[in-house]
Amino acid sequence: MRLYIRAKTDSLHAPEIVVFEKTEHLCQQKKMKDMENTSIINGRRIASDRIAELGENEIFVFGSNIHGAHGGGAARYAHQKFGAEWGVGEGLTGHTYALPTMEGDASLKQAVEHFIACAKAHPELTFLVTAVGCGIAGYTPDEVAPLFREAAPLENVYLPRVFWEVL
């Protein structure tokens, strides 16, 4: 989108050109920020281990508990920084997607299946998956990564490096 300021100009000023250049510069900065959150290596879409800001269509995917009490780890960060709603333990809120990881293997498997369905239904969004379940919940990447096997070919899903090492 290009923005222009309509104003009277004289031979010394060209506000449309100046505004256009600033807008282009800001767009380039935004694209660079988005690229910091992701990388593609050997066809693998990798989510950064450190996500400080999100692009407009980026979604921070984190592990939670079913009650949505985002009190620690990535859940707390998602709540404070990216708009994860307190009380929502699964699904899209703000610029986040909560995956309940504290309720057991069967529950986690089903939640990942729901996530994959959501990612397929929303190709306009880019999902940056953290190492869900591998912190406070106590799982290892060897246990969780296989649940994301069906997400691996999706072009809008970026998995953490530790999951790709297993897949």
Which residues does each predicted region cover?
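Macrodomain-like recognition of ADP-ribose-binding/processing modules
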Residues: 31-167
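Catalytic zinc-binding patch centered on the HExxH motif and its immediate surroundings
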Residues: 2
